[in-house]
Amino acid sequence: MIKRTLLVISLLLMATGCGEAPAACDRQCGEIRTLFTAPCGSQHSGTPADCAAWVASVSSMTRKLDSSFQGKEVEDDVSQVLPRLMTAVGDFETHKCSDVNVDNVSSTDARQSKCNEALIATRGVLGSLYFSAEVPG
């Protein structure tokens, strides 16, 4: 299973031309894995400040991936997930969510509610990227 997964990622990254396939796979998959398994990622924990920093890291990683994939052949699953991830982190940034107390509880404050939605969307879409790209564990 792991060999097949590594082959899929290597072929995906080879097709994108983002460098030496094994090195690019290690770097990009490692970054996706780290963000996915972080406290604000799949664990749904972390302080508001941690989660704001986490979204900034997801945003940076997403922009780098999108840039490296421009004009390249990329698997459909991955090419569909990246724009959704860019939208989710963009919503977080647009609402200036790093300035509010973002968490997972419901809020009557409209801005906090939008920030909670953006955080949850970012987690969900990053999970989709993690699984659609078959990032090795």
Each language-model region and where it sits:
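Bacterial N-terminal signal peptides that target proteins for export
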Residues: M1-L7
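Immediate post-signal-peptide N-terminus of mature secreted/exported proteins
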Residues: C18-A56, S60
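Hydrophobic alpha-helical membrane segments, chiefly transmembrane helices and signal peptide h-regions
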Residues: V8-L12, T122
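Long, amphipathic, charge-rich alpha-helical segments that form helical bundles/coiled-coils
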Residues: W54-A118
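C-terminal motif of bacterial Sec signal peptides marking the signal peptidase cleavage site
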Residues: L13-G17
